[in-house]
Amino acid sequence: MAMQAHYEAEATEEEHFGPQAISRLEQCGINANDVKKLEEAGFHTVEAVAYAPKKELLNIKGISEAKAEKILAEAAKLVPMGFTTATEFHQRRSEIIQISTGSKELDKLLQGGVETGSITEMFGEFRTGKTQLCHTLAVTCQLPIDRGGGEGKAMYIDTEGTFRPERLLAVAERYGLSGSDVLDNVAYARAFNTDHQTQLLYQASAMMAESRYALLIVDSATALYRTDYSGRGELSARQMHLARFLRMLLRLADEFGVAVVITNQVVAQVDGAAMFAADPKKPIGGNIIAHASTTRLYLRKGRGETRICKIYDSPCLPEAEAMFAINADGVGDAKD
């Protein structure tokens, strides 16, 4: 009896900390058919429903205004969404996991590594190490927490066809991990257009509700937007679509506590101001991507295989630089 009570207590504790399955709403008096409709529309957790605007629920066929209000009211009871003290928030922040980048210098710059529960954007020219960092993180996120990992699987959305499993095997060997296990723990998808890229996030949400993921990579988040939308005439449509995509990424980071890493390309400034700028290149996506990313890292080439990473924007990290190297076994420290 005592044992059963112990297991029940453990189960409620688990529900409290992790995302709650959408089926929980049935226990709160929501019709099973309505819960099924929510699931089909891409809502797999109570958190996803609670964070959604009412307008989004009304777009689901068969959900009336009265139903939407009832669903949101019940979801709000299960998900704490009100004010909290800064002390409590500070306590929650201390539980955030940092995933190692593979380079001690880079980890020191990021005060531990890539943060879970937020979006980290890496931008730079070609050959600056963006994709290599993504490959290394896809392996390190599987390590135990005491070794700088996130003890979870990785999800990789590739828009440019640059994903190479061989690189993961080389990094796995360096950390003494089984190559086949590492590859099994990486869910890979190739995105072919911007709508497909967004659609993949609905699938990602369903997979994250089923299994423990620590990292979601989108390499690159903006490449397809440059080809699917062209010219100034389509700029506002492009930015709206991009904003929606980034909002979904942020929601996944909030809902499942995963680290979201996106890469971005740069564009050369060709206006008059570029003559006076120290570096005439800037990340594409404008203010929309600048506001969505929590931490922005600017990567540039150094000598030989070395690369330099600069904190371009962060709410808590000071502006500084670190040097790292791209080795045969992934990202590591630069040799002096």
Swiss-Prot record:
SMART domains assigned: AAA
Recorded GO MF terms: ATP binding; ATP hydrolysis activity; ATP-dependent activity, acting on DNA; ATP-dependent DNA damage sensor activity; DNA strand exchange activity; double-stranded DNA binding; single-stranded DNA binding; single-stranded DNA helicase activity
Motif (Nuclear export signal): 242-257
Gene3D superfamilies according to UniProt: 5' to 3' exonuclease, C-terminal subdomain, P-loop containing nucleotide triphosphate hydrolases
Domain annotation HhH: ranges: 45-74
GO CC annotation: chromosome; condensed nuclear chromosome; cytoplasm; nuclear chromosome; nucleus
UniProt-listed PANTHER family: DNA REPAIR PROTEIN RAD51 HOMOLOG 1, RECA/RAD51/RADA DNA STRAND-PAIRING FAMILY MEMBER
Name of the protein described by the UniProt record: DNA repair protein RAD51 homolog A
Gene name of the encoded protein: rad51-a
Recorded family membership: Belongs to the RecA family. RAD51 subfamily.
Primary residence: nucleus
Compartment list: Nucleus; Cytoplasm; Chromosome
Single biological process term from Gene Ontology: reciprocal meiotic recombination
Keyword Nucleus applies: yes
Organism, scientific name: Xenopus laevis (African clawed frog)
Subunit structure: Forms linear homooligomers, giving rise to a RAD51 nucleoprotein filament, which is essential for strand-pairing reactions during DNA recombination.
InterPro entries, alphabetized: AAA+_ATPase, DNA_recomb/repair_Rad51, DNA_recomb/repair_Rad51_C, DNA_recomb/repair_RecA-like, DNA_repair_Rad51/TF_NusA_a-hlx, P-loop_NTPase, RecA_ATP-bd, RecA_monomer-monomer_interface
UniProt cross-references to Pfam families, sorted A to Z: HHH_5, Rad51
Purpose of the protein: Plays an important role in homologous strand exchange, a key step in DNA repair through homologous recombination (HR). Binds to single-stranded DNA in an ATP-dependent manner to form nucleoprotein filaments which are essential for the homology search and strand exchange. Catalyzes the recognition of homology and strand exchange between homologous DNA partners to form a joint molecule between a processed DNA break and the repair template. Recruited to resolve stalled replication forks during replication stress. Also involved in interstrand cross-link repair.
Keywords: ATP-binding, Chromosome, Cytoplasm, DNA-binding, Nucleotide-binding, Nucleus
